[in-house]
């Protein structure tokens, strides 16, 4: 029946399943018999198929900083495109950065942060993503800008759709917060997208009789589910609890800090105290949904397939002018419909477009909220020393790739597609760089490039987008709803192409296409680079406890820890070689006996007397040297 409220059930589709489809097959991909699991090394190969240098960008401003990275708004010097550069600042987070790059390169959804490319500098990978002009959801909620209930419901629906897509791929976020939900400001309203997939993990499958090992305790404590904080078994329902905390932030416009959002001693939501923060203008189903998602029992939390349907139903039930219409009409009988006030009628009540929480200033540390009782509450996160009051971020050391994210290649296993450098990264008509010294990032040899007609980059059509096939899932059809959905972004405005020549054609009509990182990545540079006595410089991404190459090398007697490896049919990335993805019969490069001074040089080192003029950025990024 039209308008009937969809039920909220606890158990939903199994991990990796899509509604209406069965579980993944024995092969793990769910694409039918005979289709094997795609090799994970090709996922990384495609993710870094286009490399940019730090010097290719002009740093506009620093827009944020997290626990492990700094975020900059940058502009590409040649194309003028504005992007976001997420620079990793801790060596211990290198694995998570690589895991995030691999995953984001294969996610295609309007409510998932779009991956633009990779910037490499001094052996570290930094992700390039689209720029969101609205900032984070946390910043929007703490601002004095009014947000009506339809706007808040649309923001919640966008986040739920992004997570529904992510879960349909067999992956869950594990670090969903209002800081990691970004907002795009448009003429028609706001659009929310989900970002920061550094802690994403495959959805575990706990079988009866099998040994069950819990995943690591990771995430931001204020949004972490109780079962995660207790070190118990957890799955994708932990994302549902985090989504419930985000809904509480949306409804009451308060931070997730327990000093403002009341919590219980078992890390649950203090429902009676939270109700005192919510005005009577809040749609009751919206409030009940937030309480339902924060249930302490994971099995009772609804999956995102049902949460999105429920949010769409709530939007359909809202009155046309605003959810405060019934209350506002008792005070102002002259209010008119959305078409605008008439010259002969009184001005409509301003609360028609604003919720009750908009009528008050955002909370401040000096004025804690009044929860309507005199009970003394204790911050449960301050009772555990390892959580440090909840103002930290728990990180895990990645071990394996999150997903085999690359579809099967149409080429034979002995024939790998070439890696091409986009023409926009190289000035048209200029010869290949003679200077290969650090700290400039490696540039693929010119012989690997594809000749592009014309002076500028060609337009990349929808056929260049790759379809993602992994873990028993197919492209998920988006049900029609009142929330505005952006069409899937194609790479026409991207200066960096994130697809290889083995990509499969994709049509927007077919619907949205659909970290446990290796501990070490060794990237060998092309021949001719300076930096070592035998003209073979190398970038090294060692384990978390390893130091930079600029540090003094260990004594020769120290044992060298071998790199983990997975078999692959050949060398990866052409001139680049990733140790954890390839087990080629090559000797391990010896440790440099002398300190590498290339990273400290003030000018570039050139060969054969040729000196290239370094770029002169007006505002240098951290670590960028010319």
Swiss-Prot record:
Q: What class of enzyme is it?
A: transferase
Question: What is the gene called?
Answer: TESK1
Query: Which residues lie within the region annotated Disordered?
Result: 1-41, 331-373, 423-488, 529-564
Q: Which residues carry this modification: Omega-N-methylarginine?
A: 338
CDD domains associated with the record: PKc_TESK
Q: Which EC number(s) does UniProt give?
A: 2.7.12.1
Q: Which GO terms describe its biological process?
A: actin cytoskeleton organization; establishment of vesicle localization; negative regulation of cilium assembly; nuclear-transcribed mRNA catabolic process, no-go decay; podocyte cell migration; positive regulation of protein localization to nucleus; positive regulation of stress fiber assembly; positive regulation of substrate adhesion-dependent cell spreading
The outcome of changing residue 539 to Y is:
In breast cancer samples; infiltrating ductal carcinoma; somatic mutation
Residue ranges of the region described as Required for interaction with SPRED1 and SPRY2. Required for TESK1-mediated dephosphorylation of SPRY2 and SPRY2 inhibition of ERK phosphorylation: 527-626
Which parts of the sequence are annotated with region: Required for interaction with YWHAB? Answer: 419-524
Domain remarks in the Swiss-Prot or TrEMBL record:
The extracatalytic C-terminal part is highly rich in proline residues.
- What is the name of the protein in this document? Dual specificity testis-specific protein kinase 1
**Recorded GO MF terms:** ATP binding; metal ion binding; protein kinase activity; protein kinase binding; protein serine kinase activity; protein serine/threonine kinase activity; protein serine/threonine kinase inhibitor activity; protein serine/threonine/tyrosine kinase activity
What reactions does this protein catalyze?
L-seryl-[protein] + ATP = O-phospho-L-seryl-[protein] + ADP + H(+); L-threonyl-[protein] + ATP = O-phospho-L-threonyl-[protein] + ADP + H(+); L-tyrosyl-[protein] + ATP = O-phospho-L-tyrosyl-[protein] + ADP + H(+)
Tissues where the protein occurs: Expressed in podocytes and renal tubular cells in the kidney (at protein level).
Q: Which UniProt keywords apply?
A: ATP-binding, Cell projection, Cytoplasm, Cytoskeleton, Kinase, Magnesium, Manganese, Metal-binding, Methylation, Nucleotide-binding, Phosphoprotein, Serine/threonine-protein kinase, Transferase, Tyrosine-protein kinase
Q: How is it modified after translation?
A: Autophosphorylated on serine and tyrosine residues.
Q: Which family does it belong to?
A: Belongs to the protein kinase superfamily. TKL Ser/Thr protein kinase family.
Protein localization: Cytoplasm; Cytoplasm, Perinuclear region; Cytoplasm, Cytoskeleton, Microtubule organizing center, Centrosome; Cell projection, Lamellipodium
Activity regulation statement: Activated by autophosphorylation on Ser-220. Kinase activity is inhibited by SPRED1.
Q: How does it assemble?
A: Interacts (via both C- and N-termini) with SPRY4 (via C-terminus); the interaction inhibits TESK1 kinase activity. Interacts with TAOK1; the interaction inhibits TAOK1 kinase activity. Interacts (via C-terminus) with SPRED1 (via C-terminus); the interaction inhibits TESK1 kinase activity. Interacts (via C-terminus) with PARVA/PARVIN (via C-terminus); the interaction inhibits TESK1 kinase activity. Interacts with YWHAB/14-3-3 beta; the interaction is dependent on the phosphorylation of TESK1 Ser-437 and inhibits TESK1 kinase activity. Interacts with SPRY1, SPRY3 and SPRED2.
Q: Composition bias, kind Basic and acidic residues: at what positions?
A: 348-357
Major localization listed first in the record, in broad terms: cytoplasm
Region Required for interaction with PARVA, annotated ranges: 527-624
